[in-house]
Amino acid sequence: MSIRDSIKERILILDGAMGTMIQGYNLTEKDFRGRLELLQMLNYQGNNDMLNLTRPDVIEDIHRRYLKAGADIITTNTFSSQRVSQADYHLESSARDMALEGAKIARKCADEFSTADKPRFVAGSIGPTNKTCSMSPDVSDPAKRDLTYDSLFESYSEQVAAMIEGGIDVILIETIFDTLNAKVAVDASISEMCKAGVDLPVMLSVTITDLSGRTLSGQTLDAFLASVSSYPIFSIGLNCSFGAEQMRPYLKELSAKAPYYISIYPNAGLPNSMGLYDETADTMVPQMATYIDDKLVNIIGGCCGTTDDFIAGYAKIVKGKSPHIPVEWPKEIILSGLEQFRLSPEITFVNVGERCNVAGSRKFLRLIKEKNYEEALTIARKQVDDGALVLDINMDDGLLEAKEEMVHFLNMVSSEPEIARVPLMIDSSDWSVVVAALKCVQGKSIVNSISLKEGEDSFIQHAKDVLRYGAAVVVMCFDEEGQATSFERRIEIASRAYKILTEKVGFPAQDIIFDPNILAICTGMKEHNSYALDFIRAAEWIKKNLPGAHVSGGVSNLSFSFRGNNYIREAMHAVFLYHAIQAGMDFGIVNPATKVTYADIPEAHLKIIEDVVLDRVEGSDELLIDLANKILEQKDEQVENGVNHSSSDQEAWRSESLEERLVYALRKGISTYLNEDIHEALQKYSRAVDVIEGPLMRGMNEVGDLFGAGKMFLPQVVKTARTMKDAVAILQPYIEKEKVGGKAIAGKVLLATVKGDVHDIGKNIVGVVMACNNYEVIDMGVMVPADKIIKKAKEEKVDLIGLSGLITPSLQEMVNDVVAFKEAGLNIPVMIGGATTSQLHVALKIAPLYDSPVVWIKDASVNPSIAAVLLNKRERENFCKELNKTYECLRAGYKEQQLKILSLDKARENKLNLFE
């Protein structure tokens, strides 16, 4: 029976620590040296992998002790059996022998204990080495690397080949602190398995370095899962760093999200002040039992500080217990930088920042030529601040060494967490540059691009490279006959490429992004007039006929004919995107700081531009050219008369009423006049909070409506949120002054944006409104896991908990939170708010899981009144009765509605028959 069969039937036991057990043998320097000819000036004690060569009897004894204790899987003593790690001891030439002998020793012991009923397996241990591909060893030189992908690949390949020869059953890549190192190990493992003609399961085990829930190289668990999602992984788990109890929230997250078997082998608790581990088998076994009872795991074992006593205890508690059933991976494109990006339903469009492209930004090109990387990074940072969800990086210029510049800049980016948190788009026409770039990013990137231009063989090889390095891909609609310019050619090439990728390469459909070519219109050539419309039609066809695939394009190409007229260009882009997104375009390389939105365009201009973009009126291109010329002439006249065009526009909206000015400022993301207008509002409104609840909330609601209608995009919403924060900051001192001195605190409320969600503007407004009403507010920020909320709620003895979330996955996270609250014994009322939340969702999914009230809050202004009722014992009882009645009505209505929905088979029976 193979391990793939065994794991379906029961929970498997992995062995415990090797180093801890070795310490018990009190070995000396002489034991480590054995008969090897070694340098006298070096101390080899502690280089445990040497013992495979010098004291194999000790390693055999340890394996046998674990097998006797009940281990199903023993781990080879090869954690550091690779040249990179052994270089510290000048033993590079012995690394392969250590790996080979380590595998042979474990194989021998496993075979001794294997039976038909209980087969024993050998996991070949691959450690992370003592160096990292993703981080600089020198704080003064962030682009420097001690280790390259290629050198580590060579080192790991030698180790894996030796372990396969030695007879391992599984490859275990463990104690992962840098995802890029792990990707190299997976790549080397797959490569060596192909050479050897074997297919071994690959296990990954991550180390969370602190309570932030991130790896040492900065990735969240979500981001890590995205980074390795292209690989054939057998299991994913956690080891080292923490004890069992501290791993609980991270294990629950993995079990809920990872489409693999789940492993956990924690340390024997946290080390004490002497560096020793205080947990014993008796104290840790019950902790592990809870994970088994909750069906969170498939493989359990031990790391630092654990011994065969721990494993014997684990063997008893797994008997008769059901293993974890892996979840399915979402059929959506999921990317990552330091954080995960998931194209979920509420994200209608992914704006890819275009300014870090030497071909598209003269400033960026100049900075790269001048080696002014720090300022070049500010361009990247500004795009992220402006709402870019992905960053395009391109170094293709005849006067640049593109490969060197790409690698250097990407290494610089990885040192900037605020930039590195978003995924990257690797953009180059030189395939060697693309490969070099993929070898220095730990996240899941997008390659821009591949095509059939050089034929099918080249296309397949490039696609395999993309898959090998764990990326998604942009596919240009370009083949051996040239670039597709008509609708028919676009869909012909897309269909052919999709079939090759999914059927011949095995590329995940959701990781394919087609670029059907956005080409310039209004060029004076009639055959170009339909280019935009044909792109839109092609986008719609791709989404309907190529399941899972996405559509992207370089939007600025569309308006190339109007260089120098930014208003016309941005207006054309806004109109094009409005229609293309509705047709299915979900990615686009754009300037995230664009100022013109679809809603801003005057009706007369809008008709002309739509006629051109949609090619619906002959001669409309001439009308657009006339409009562009008039705008330029007006600008020239104003310059001659000493009038600034932009200032005249400002005067127009500045003459509106105070409320309209504030709404306009929010909608456009303009902070310039906020100080002036807020102080005028303070003279008009009796309380500072009334300014928030009045014109500012109205502005936010308008932005929400425009965003929902597709007339504003995420970068513009981000600017609005930033402007709202600025407005609240101006009002804050006045809010503090207006608090009634000496008045008793109305209550203590804890606010948090749930784990996985970085949006905080709504939560921040709630905090201000609650503070104005004399509530003490404890704001925990964004991406807050349940365990931290519980801990803070207990420490502060809060009266209310407010959970906020903007994105769809936050709905499930809120469900998880209240379940955790109940398990922790909390009976604190919970208020739920955020753009994707609803009273129906609370009634169906959240409220039934919690014993105390869970209340959906429509907007910030009603929070204080709801809170006051919840904290008044007399009023709370009646309120909860009415609330429960409301929830029961909602549930009953939903159930009745669901009963009216026929099954698919029944609906097919009722179909209209046109042939009788």
Place the predicted regions along the sequence by residue.
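Domain-level signal for soluble alpha/beta catalytic cores
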Residues: 1-916
